[in-house]
Amino acid sequence: MDMNELARRVKEASIVLASAGTELKNRALAQIARSLQDGREEIIRANREDLLRSEKENLPGPLLKRLKFDEAKIQEVIEGIHSLIELEDPVGRTLLSTELDDGLELYKVTCPIGVIGVIFESRPDALVQISTLCLKSGNGVLLKGGSEARETNRVLAAIIAGATHKAGLPPDWIALLETRSDVGEMLKMDKYIDLIIPRGSNEFVRYIMDNSRIPVLGHADGICHLYVDEDADIQMAVKIAVDAKTQYVAVCNAVETLLVHEKIAPAFLPELKKAMDARQVELIGCPRTRAVIPAAPATEEDWRTEYLDLKLSVKVVAGLDEAIGHINTYGSGHTDGIITRSGEKAARFMDYVDSGNVFWNCSTRFSDGFRYGFGAEVGISTSKVHARGPVGLDGLVIYKYRLIGNGHIVGDYAGRLKTFKHRKMNKDYGIVTK
């Protein structure tokens, strides 16, 4: 089918989906979970084909690991769907209600964005997570997965479309794109697609951001920092730094640079070195760091590097303000934390660091939609427009203003026959239809 026609159908179906009630959407999600359960053998067979072909094509080990979609992964996404059903519907919430004048009421009410274009690499579980989040939030979705997962993605998209159709929704709300050229076309389709969400490597996300006509929600880099203040608990700081770096290194919320106050450096750095050596972490330090512990020499480029590996840059700083300046200069606006006993310093850090997630005395690895209680996430945004940080259901809705009157005209107010009252109401939007 022509791609424009495919996108047009998704757009049309998204309008129907946007008006679907919570009960219908949850029924469709439950049907998806049942259909995934029933289709386990077909899914695993398709995934085995993808794995065998990708091994022959010498796909790197980390990508092969992400590509694998076995019994455990299927069960995981099914459990995720059941958790999603339990979450509050983000659509139809009244954010503001104002009586402009007698009988003239204004409501600001959440609504779906429209059609989401999602471009992702390797992970078939991302297809299920993102499409079900789009369904719950009332959005149509155009999906472009990596060619390495094409058989698995075909089966999953067909199962999801069939399940939602069975539940009473139009199947065209979801569509799968398969060819590489589809990505370029997709990025030009601002007539049909309202938001692009890329999931993949830094280079991949940067390419999408640089070549899209459509707003992009995501992040290209995850250069996360921890700052160890002069009055930090040393054992706490070591424990947090180890977790933030090594709990899972190949993720965007792993710490890449550690900033250390000069007064605590002589006591803290040897303890850090001992703990990181035990986990095979290579330390890369500034001259002041290397005066205290052995470390590879850091260059200017190291402060801008997302390693996604067992490497950690370390810099000794004069104090809190230098740490904040460093983070705002070299950071990516993702997640940054401070370790200190001082509430005053923590507050200053959280106010002045220009990032979507700012933490006090805890690991950067907590920056995650599931850990925040969002159920799941479509990604993490470092943007300051619309959504920021881990993006769950709330990040997939926008709002519309609904004004209800009874023959009101602007001429009466322009001519001063009437004046506005602008009274705040504690009232949810609703129209009696019977």
Swiss-Prot record:
Q: Keyword check for Nucleotide-binding, yes or no.
A: no
Superkingdom classification of source = Bacteria
Q: In which pathway does it act?
A: Amino-acid biosynthesis; L-proline biosynthesis; L-glutamate 5-semialdehyde from L-glutamate: step 2/2
* InterPro entries the UniProt entry points to: Ald_DH/histidinol_DH, Ald_DH_C, Ald_DH_N, Aldehyde_DH_dom, G-glutamylP_reductase_CS, Glu-5-SA_DH, GPR_dom
A biological-process GO annotation: L-proline biosynthetic process
Transmembrane segments annotated in the record for this chain: none
Q: Which reaction does it catalyse?
A: L-glutamate 5-semialdehyde + phosphate + NADP(+) = L-glutamyl 5-phosphate + NADPH + H(+)
Might you report a single GO cellular component term? cytoplasm
Q: What is its EC number?
A: 1.2.1.41
Where in the cell does this protein reside?
Cytoplasm
Assigned keywords, A-Z: Amino-acid biosynthesis, Cytoplasm, NADP, Oxidoreductase, Proline biosynthesis
Which is one GO molecular function term here? NADP binding
Q: Describe the function of this protein.
A: Catalyzes the NADPH-dependent reduction of L-glutamate 5-phosphate into L-glutamate 5-semialdehyde and phosphate. The product spontaneously undergoes cyclization to form 1-pyrroline-5-carboxylate.
The record's HAMAP family line, in alphabetical order, gives: ProA (MF_00412)
Family designation: Belongs to the gamma-glutamyl phosphate reductase family.
Name of the featured protein: Gamma-glutamyl phosphate reductase
